[in-house]
Amino acid sequence: MNASGEYDSTSGLAQWANARYAPETSAECSSLATPAHTDESLTILTTLPEARAAVNTAASAAQRMISIYTPDLEPELYDQTAFLEIIKRFVLSRSFSKVRVLLVDPARVLRDSNRFVAMGRRLSSYIDIRYVAGHAPQRASAYLIADDRAIVYRLRADTWDGIADLNNHAVARLHLNEFDNVWNASAPDHALRVARRG
């Protein structure tokens, strides 16, 4: 507001408040720090087909690494032919590529047949699956991060509601740092390795 009590849309505070929702149009706004992504890269997810499409799109965009945090390798997402083909192409076309998976509750993976685990057995130098260590912080969320740019994130793993942002380095990096901390605290579990061979 200016001295006469009217709303002043050119003030720095007003520009900051509106920066998230309005495109930058003036030179004064250019000095504000803005994320390196566009609203077009953000998608709201509410259904399983939307979640599948987002996971497939993000994984297809990966160049170096895919990191997955999941309760049980959610077969509705990760045991699907389209996703498995994307992962296979990803790891076989790049000698330096890596897929890392953190499992919160591996009981279902050990009990049920899972094609992703079978692929991990065949391509063990590219696909690494670990259990979340008991002392590591566990989240109710589930997510996939491609490199350090694209993320498909669901606040609760028991629902398909979430977001997909294919070009948000800051948010992807934040969750990747969290993933790395849990990854480093979680050693590969021998039970899954035995299950892979059996």
Task: Indicate where each model-derived feature is located.
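HKD (HxKxxxxD) catalytic microenvironment of the phospholipase D
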Residues: 128-172
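Interdomain hinge/linker segments and adjacent boundary elements that couple functional modules
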Residues: 2-74
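Long, hydrophobic, amphipathic alpha-helical segments used as structural scaffolds
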Residues: 70, 98, 103, 127, ...
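Amphipathic coiled-coil/heptad-repeat helices and related helical stalk/stem segments
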Residues: 51-52, 83, 175
